[in-house]
């Protein structure tokens, strides 16, 4: 697998991606919407998971993985993030557009904690079953999962449910249509590269599980969440990950680009 280096612009402790319309703050690891809204949900999520300072560096630091292995775990864990679009970690702006991720590191930890650890190519060894947190140390699977779940979601589950209901009131099947439109748009350019068009069954499943996870009562049943995440990952993996990862960079406009250093206005 080939490494991909992404030249970016740094200003005011932020990594700015003007072409994509957002910036990553190095201080609190949040996303800021800049001059124009984020046009592609999948583009932002995939970009975050491909960017070494976040996903790859996290896997390298805490698991001793190589960059290629870190890329592998990052992309394969992407499917687990989609049901959490309605969690307190995500704030919605007007319409189907992200405003911020708060905090990004917790989503990364949670996506690793739900139990999906792919085998690295050429090796039978898998990632450990418990993520190592420098603040808490290694813990049992149950204790670590509960702690991550509460830190990432439980503290604001009522607000999450309220946000979900408000979003659904703005229009029928908003989330399903957003994700379906994105995947279909990409598929037009990459029909021979491993992408699949999402149908109503796929989108209904995503929406149903997302709604279920957003209900406070469900948080008491961690095994339900784990089963739901594993179930949905089997479908979303084909929908969200191309057969050849370089196609992603070519067809979603994520080629290497330099940022104008004059970005103080953002």
From Swiss-Prot:
InterPro entries given in the database record: Virus_P0 (IPR006755)
Example GO biological process: viral process
Keyword check for Cell division: no
Domain of life: Viruses
UniProt keyword annotations, A-Z: Host-virus interaction, Inhibition of host innate immune response by virus, Suppressor of RNA silencing, Viral immunoevasion
Pfam family name, one: Luteo_PO
Described function: Suppressor of RNA-mediated gene silencing, also known as post-transcriptional gene silencing (PTGS), a mechanism of plant viral defense that limits the accumulation of viral RNAs.
Protein name: Putative suppressor of silencing
Lineage: Viruses, Riboviria, Orthornavirae, Pisuviricota, Pisoniviricetes
